[in-house]
Amino acid sequence: MILHAQAKHGKPGLPWLVFLHGFSGDCHEWQEVGEVFADYSRLYVDLPGHGGSAAISVDGFDDVTGLLCKTLVSYNILDFWLVGYSLGGRVAMMAACQGLAGLCGVVVEGGHPGLQNAEQRTQRQRSDRQWAQRFRTEPLTAVFADWYQQPVFASLNDEQRRELVALRSNNNGATLAAMLEATSLAVQPDLRANLSARTFAFYYLCGERDSKFRALAAELAAECHVIPRAGHNAHRENPAGVIASLAQILRF
């Protein structure tokens, strides 16, 4: 079994760019940014429970990274960058820390490196279970209307929230709930030590209005790019800013 993905081929000899979306996104999420880099081959992945991979269920991060590795092999991707947002960034960091042959580097936008104590994990598990129950039982428009009121999305205006609620409500609530629980921050290890000891290039992107993740970025041994005029979802709020940073990272 492999993950559903869209592949776009570029020039031979350059590494692939493998894009991983955030929770409730899909393989289209990164394409406005990725298609600027047409010289590179691009793989836009649907994570389990999402898009074309909605029917794929997992029990945890090991299952996700295993599926990602099989997907890369199936496309004969030998050299690549992982570019991930939020959940996709956490998957990218997890996979990279486990060791991936052919990995050139990791670019994470607003991805959490992991909680650091049991109390935080317990609180997060309780919160994620409550959200998962809502995703399973309530209309998605109602759930996402509340989801995008969370403090991390404070930089969004009303129009942006309405657009995201409409877009994300096309998902399957049950499969989103299962993926939310399987990849909860409550079950993700703290990756800070592994990231400090890494052997791969590591870059971190965060919006200038995303105070929570700017603070987290300062804890990581990574080159940080602060995206102007953007909050947590920087590649959506300021795609040109993310494109500029990615071009600098890739020396495009």
Curated annotation (Swiss-Prot):
Coiled coil: none annotated. GO terms for molecular function: 2-succinyl-6-hydroxy-2,4-cyclohexadiene-1-carboxylate synthase activity. Pfam families: Abhydrolase_6. Its EC number is 4.2.99.20. Belongs to the AB hydrolase superfamily. MenH family. It is an enzyme of class 4 (lyase). SUPFAM superfamilies: alpha/beta-Hydrolases (SSF53474). Keywords: Lyase, Menaquinone biosynthesis. One of its GO terms (biological process) is menaquinone biosynthetic process. It comes from Escherichia coli (strain SMS-3-5 / SECEC). Monomer. It comes from the Bacteria. It catalyses: 5-enolpyruvoyl-6-hydroxy-2-succinyl-cyclohex-3-ene-1-carboxylate = (1R,6R)-6-hydroxy-2-succinyl-cyclohexa-2,4-diene-1-carboxylate + pyruvate. Catalyzes a proton abstraction reaction that results in 2,5-elimination of pyruvate from 2-succinyl-5-enolpyruvyl-6-hydroxy-3-cyclohexene-1-carboxylate (SEPHCHC) and the formation of 2-succinyl-6-hydroxy-2,4-cyclohexadiene-1-carboxylate (SHCHC). Pathway: Quinol/quinone metabolism; 1,4-dihydroxy-2-naphthoate biosynthesis; 1,4-dihydroxy-2-naphthoate from chorismate: step 3/7; Quinol/quinone metabolism; menaquinone biosynthesis. This is 2-succinyl-6-hydroxy-2,4-cyclohexadiene-1-carboxylate synthase. The gene is menH. Gene3D superfamilies: alpha/beta hydrolase.
